[in-house]
Amino acid sequence: VVASGSVRDGSAPIVLVNREGAFELPEGLGTPHYWVGAPVADVDLDGRLDVFGLEWEPSLPSRLFRNVTPGGHWLQVSVADPVGGVGSAVEVFANDGALLGSREIGAASGYSSGKPAVAHFGLGDVDVVSVVITTRAGETVTIDDVQVDVHLRWPDGC
């Protein structure tokens, strides 16, 4: 997704849909828009990331693109501290030690946009993982045998 080109030239945002390896423009997006941002978050809490196109022009609508693709396993991680975990690093490992993903928790997403302070991981077929969290203060914690398809809050219950 390219959220914007230029407000002055009437550029249309580029949104392509992957259909079996061929990318296509979805229906209804042939008119010029100027999306100043396109934050990504799991809006409907189904484990798949959705995109929200923020329209610049007040007379034109912003648009939520719900991800309705077949989903695999997933994990979301948040950290409770005075700044909502922003700056904490999260790594997720398979049981064999393979790194599945690494994220830094942040709350910014482009111009004039924000997102939840959550690290999101798509895990495919993996159903149990280990999570390593390193806080801004430098504290590192490892949590083994984490079940997936959940929002893990650390410390527990944050």
Regions found by a protein language model. Give the residues of each.
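Electropositive polyanion-binding surfaces
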Residues: V1-V2
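Beta-propeller blade signature
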Residues: L16-V17
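Gly/Ser/Thr/Pro-enriched helix-cap/hinge segments flanking short amphipathic alpha-helices
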Residues: S6, A12, F23-C158
